[in-house]
């Protein structure tokens, strides 16, 4: 885990006893940001607040959406990798990343690259196998793309989406 916001609900709301939890937030192999070959590469454990300055320059609408994504404290620990791995239907980053044709690197016994649109298998179900994790998110940087994100929620900030839409082209 990095932020652990979804996992915490497993304990507090469902009373699940989680025996093996590993903190990945300080793992340097999962905590990085770099631009290479017209792509933004983000380590899966990189906090949302660390990503914001890059997104503000590349995709301002995406950055603006993240400013409504939880409190400052949550954005300091929450990660896109965690948001994707939980496969929550209310995850705000998934529609944007899919609209941008993003990919993820999954690592376990083997390493594989997967288009994000093929990663989700159903409600809280993904392609991840036992002993695999999301290592990296790859977002294409295309100056010809336009991106608009729209989030509707009961409260303006720090609330789950009732409706979320991302359009790119």
Regions found by a protein language model. Give the residues of each.
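C-terminal structural segment of proteins
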Residues: 1-169
């Amino acid at each position: 885990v990095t932020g652990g916001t979804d996992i915490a609900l497993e304990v507090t709301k469902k009373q699940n006893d989680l025996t093996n939890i590993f903190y990945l937030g300080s793992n340097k192999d999962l905590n990085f940001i770099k631009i290479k070959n017209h792509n933004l590469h983000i380590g899966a454990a990189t906090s949302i607040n660390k990503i914001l300055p890059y997104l503000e320059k590349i995709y301002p609408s995406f950055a603006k959406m993240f400013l409504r994504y939880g409190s400052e404290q949550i954005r300091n620990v929450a990660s896109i990798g965690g948001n994707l791995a939980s496969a929550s239907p209310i995850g705000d980053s998934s529609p944007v990343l899919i609209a941008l044709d993003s990919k993820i690197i999954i690592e376990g016994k083997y390493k594989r690259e997967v288009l994000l649109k093929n990663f989700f298998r159903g409600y809280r179900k993904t392609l991840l196998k036992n002993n695999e994790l999301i290592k990296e998110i790859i977002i294409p940087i295309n100056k010809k793309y336009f991106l608009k994100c729209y989030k509707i929620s009961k409260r303006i900030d720090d609330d789950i989406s009732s409706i979320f839409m991302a359009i790119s082209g």
